[in-house]
Every structure is written in C-alpha cells, then in structure tokens.
Amino acid sequence: MAKHGFKMIDAEMHVMEPVDLWERYIDPEFKDRAPRRLNERRWDIRTVVEGQVMASMPGGDWPALSDAEEKALGDRYAEAIARGFDPESQVRAMDKEGLDLAILYPTSAMYITAFDTMDPRFAEAACRAYNDWLHDYIQAGDPGRIFGAAAVSPHDVPTAVAEARRAVGSLGMKAVFLRPNIYNGRPWHDPAYDPLWAACQELDVPVGFHETTGSRMKAAGADRFKSLGIAHISTHSVEQMLA
C-alpha cells in the first residue's frame, strides 16, 4: 500500500467502543459508577459519566441524524456495522483506504474525563480501563499496523504520569491523548503539567490533543451556537489552537 516509497499513515483513526467497555474493564471498586455508551439509536455516541450525558448540546440533546445521513453512514460503514466495529473491521477499513499504519483515538472515551470536579481516582480508573481495552483490541486486530493513543486523566498529574508510563511501557501505546480544554482552571502551559510533558519526552511519544463537541468542559464557541455543525467547527478548531 506504500505509494512512491512512502508509507500511508492515518494519525487519527477512531474506534467505536462497545457499550459495555467500562463495565467489563474498569476496576471493580468503580464498577457501579462505570461510564457507559448509550445504544438507544443508531450512531449513538452519547456517553454517561457520573450521571452526566455527554455528547449533548447546551440546553438540548445530541440531534438525531436525518434519513439521508443515516443512509450515507449505513452504506459507508455497512461492513463494520455487520461486524460490530470489531478489530478486523478496523483493519479492513484501512485496506480499503490504502493505509499502512494507523494511530487509534477514542470516540466515547473522549468524554470520560470531560468535566471539572471529577473524582481523580475515578477518572484515572476510567482511563486505565479504556487503555486496557484498546490494548486487547489492537492485539486482536493487527498490532503491526494499528497502534494506540493512551488516555490519561489531567485531574491528577502524578496519576497521569504513571498511566502514561504504564500505557507506553506495558501496553505498547505510541502516543498520549488529551482534550485541549482547560481542566480545573489550569491551562496546558501551567507548570503543574511539566512532569507529564517530561514523562512523554522521556518515553519518546507525542501528545495528541483532540476536542469533542458536547462535553461538560468549557469550549470556545459552545455557548454561542445551537447548531451542532457550527459548534463543532468552532470548538474543534479554536480549542486545538488555544491548546
């Protein structure tokens, strides 16, 4: 699949997590609080974290897809849907797109640390569970072609450092994933995060920032637009630049 001697790499390919990921993988201490992805309609990425329904617009629910959107997505992802978005479907999608390698980012797990005042231990447990699942997912697919970006929780920097070390050293992750939003009043240039940046530098892995619309974090433009499309354009582009 290499073209003109260059490998084709997708640096941000998303997974569709199973609805019971955290129920199966989270530390038993937190099982009664486990995040869960809703499955009440097709393409449901809404995720419940500590009673908060993420992927919802201010003052309302995440809008349902139109019939045309349903058909377009259904046609495009027919094979993956039939396989339940399993690891094999991820690899087959890469084959169709002519990709040699891909770094996998989350969908539902984008929301598992996404509001202030979270219990830091719970947030860390949710990240560990996702990383453990992603490792198993990659091993069941093609670990020579698909690689993971580990989720770490900014709610407690020492545990974020520890999880980055575990995810890279023990699980083979190739990047660390963070949301670009300000957590607990601390922008990313705050010296409190220096140990995390130092750990990533020592581990020789990049940090990837990725915004999602509809979280409980303050996001640029989220309070100005009722349209999902416009809010998405604003929050994703501006938050990335601000980070």
Language-model features, listed with the residues they occupy:
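Helix-coil boundary/capping segments in enzymes
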Residues: 1-243
